[in-house]
């Protein structure tokens, strides 16, 4: 979990353009918050560009005059937007319509066209998520505040990657809570009495997606 190899794989996949909307958004936000990860992405970008330049038999794309106009307009439009990748999708992050799952825990599902589920999660100070595991991978990026679990403490710009072998019980810091961006490839599996209720809630909710 959280190995350098896993993080490098995520960044390289992003640089290669192999991701859908969910992981592209997640990784771009990770690079936005983490300067060290952004430097790695630049290295991968340069490597891929060099490899591409050495390929034979590939002709440069011929552009029309109208293509140039569209490109200039697009760049100008994007430059007027905030640098935060999330703000480009949902606007002002302070005006999110949070949905309460249980006391101290709120979420907001992002409008992306992808099989992976992408959510913003907001946990009040000291709030915990019951012990759980995952049927697929889970990616968590701390946007504000911090949380801790059995494997360490995670602050703004830190990323955690979990798989089916990991069980953890995240708890938001007691000072200012935690806001995270989360991707889950499949359903979350909770343990314990409260976990059983959440599993039932998740099962019922799946019929209304």
Residue ranges of model-derived segments:
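Conserved hydrophobic/aromatic beta-strand scaffold that supports enzyme active sites
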Residues: 107-109, 118-122, 139, 159-161, ...
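Short histidine-centered beta-strand/loop micro-motifs
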Residues: 111, 121, 130-134, 150-152, ...
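Double-stranded beta-helix
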Residues: 181-209
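A short glycine-rich, His/Asp/Glu-containing loop-to-beta-strand
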Residues: 95-125, 130
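Glycine- and acidic-residue-biased ligand/ion/polar-headgroup-sensing regions
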Residues: 124-127, 134-149
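Ligand-binding loop in jelly-roll beta-barrel domains
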Residues: 166-190
């Amino acid at each position: 979990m959280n190995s350098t190899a896993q993080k490098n794989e995520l960044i390289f996949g992003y640089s290669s353009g192999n991701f859908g909307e969910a992981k592209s958004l997640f990784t771009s936000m990770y690079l936005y918050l983490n300067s060290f990860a952004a430097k790695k992405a630049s290295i991968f970008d340069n490597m891929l560009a060099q490899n591409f330049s050495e390929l034979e038999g590939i002709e440069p794309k011929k552009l029309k005059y109208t293509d140039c106009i569209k490109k200039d307009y697009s760049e100008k439009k994007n430059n007027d937007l905030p640098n935060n990748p999330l703000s480009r999708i949902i606007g002002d992050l302070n005006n999110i319509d949070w949905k309460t799952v249980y006391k101290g825990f709120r979420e907001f599902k992002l409008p992306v066209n992808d099989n992976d589920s992408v959510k913003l999660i907001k946990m009040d100070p000291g709030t915990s998520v019951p012990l759980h595991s995952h049927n697929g991978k889970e990616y968590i990026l701390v946007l504000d505040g911090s949380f801790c679990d059995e494997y360490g403490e995670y602050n703004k710009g830190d990323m955690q990657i979990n798989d089916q072998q990991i069980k953890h019980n995240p708890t938001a810091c007691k000072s200012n809570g935690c806001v995270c961006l989360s991707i889950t490839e499949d359903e979350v599996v909770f343990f314990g009495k409260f976990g059983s209720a959440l599993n039932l809630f998740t099962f019922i909710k799946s019929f209304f997606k």
